Curated annotation (Swiss-Prot):
This is Wortmanamides biosynthesis cluster protein C. The keyword Glycosyltransferase does not apply. Residues 293-312, 344-363 are annotated as: Disordered. It is found in: Membrane. Glycans are attached at N321. It is a multi-pass membrane protein. It comes from Talaromyces wortmannii (Penicillium wortmannii).
Length: 363
């Protein structure tokens, strides 16, 4: 059979998108491991979860490519009439892709939550509990999705052969029931990241950069609602192809959100990007906050406090590699310096020649 996917624009869009994003997802995870080696950190649980997520990302896109190749430019109803066997094979790849997608969603979120735990969880009981609750919620959703998918059609054989007597649940209802709670977990993870970042002694622009970084999770959640809207399209073929397309984009964005925090010590251009973004977007806000802070400090502190450093910045946060959480003690600490990376300690001169050494080496 001739290659006729270009005859339909939606199928062609799906085909090209999956072909492009699949190798990009592999590169994203590969760069993550290069970054880990550069800072001499041992490969951790979160890194292997990212590998698992990448494998299921590839399998999901492969299933989508196989399904669209079997459809080969035809309408769904046309395929059912012309070749019921092709329709059956296409639906088998389709349902396999759904299970791969469920597994990818679980593994990538667990990887992000493991990163949260390494950085914030050990030093904060509340954060640790929230991380565990979100991990448990996503695991329960994964199990529920897998069970529910098996009952979408009764009997299940009708999913692959429309001539079999029975009934199938509406596709829109199925997508709504799956993507809505999935997106809510995405939003909850981003909100948790914002809450954990808030008490850190970072400048406003640094906090903004970290917030935007984890804000990719919002993009993942929003794509879930886009998929829900697409499902209710009047064209079954359009809905079928566009959901697969947006699923590929969604999974890639999740992988990027999972691995991007590791790139700061590997690709200086990433840090430069955040610096430029913060400079252009928040310059006026920083000036206002700086003037307000200066006026308050002049009233509260003596002349010896004017040279105090504001605390660790963006590079220090992303370069943190400790096995302990991010603890920023208020009182000076003169104990051993547990440096697990190659970044030199940041020394903050205090009044009366006291010094506080804080080491951050995140990847």
């Amino acid at each position: 059979m001739a290659f006729e996917i270009p005859e339909d624009s939606t199928q062609l869009s799906q085909f090209v998108t999956l072909l492009i994003f699949t190798p990009l997802g592999i590169v994203v995870t590969a760069l993550r491991f290069v970054a880990v080696r550069r800072v001499t950190r041992k490969v951790g649980f979160e890194d292997w979860l990212a590998v698992i997520a990448t494998i299921f990302f590839i399998l999901t896109n492969l299933a989508g490519l196989m399904a669209i190749s079997i459809l080969n430019g035809r309408q769904l109803t046309q395929e059912v009439i012309e070749s019921p066997s092709d329709y059956s094979r296409m639906r088998k790849w389709d349902i396999a892709g759904l299970f791969f997608y469920f597994a990818q969603t679980l593994s990538v979120k667990l990887s992000i939550l493991a990163f949260y735990h390494r950085i914030f969880g050990i030093s904060s009981t509340r954060c640790r509990i929230c991380i565990y609750l979100l991990a448990a919620a996503q695991t329960i959703l994964f199990i529920a999705f897998c069970i529910f998918q098996g009952f979408q059609c009764i009997p299940l054989q009708r999913y692959f052969d429309l001539s079999v007597p029975g009934e199938c649940k509406d596709e829109g209802t199925v997508i709504l029931g799956g993507e809505l709670p999935n997106s809510l977990v995405d939003f909850a993870m981003v909100i948790l990241a914002m809450i954990m970042i808030r008490p850190l002694q970072l400048s406003f622009s640094d906090k903004f950069r970290v917030t935007v970084l984890f804000g990719l999770g919002f993009v993942v959640g929003i794509i879930g609602f886009v998929k829900i809207a697409v499902t209710y399209s009047t064209s079954e073929l359009y809905a079928f192809s566009m959901i697969a397309l947006w699923t590929g984009v969604q999974m890639f964005t999740a992988l990027l959100c999972c691995s991007l925090p590791m790139y700061n010590t590997f690709l200086p251009i990433v840090a430069d990007f955040w610096n430029r973004l913060s400079h252009h977007s928040l310059g006026w806000v920083s000036r206002v906050r700086s003037s307000q802070s200066s006026s308050k400090n002049s009233r509260k502190h003596g002349p010896y406090d004017s040279d105090q450093s504001p605390g660790p910045g963006w590079d220090d946060l992303v370069a943190y590699n400790g096995t302990k959480g991010l603890t920023l003690p208020q009182a000076p600490y003169h104990g051993d310096n547990h440096a697990l990376g190659n970044v030199s300690p940041i020394t903050h001169p205090q009044a009366y020649s006291k010094q506080t050494t804080r080491q951050f080496d995140v990847v």
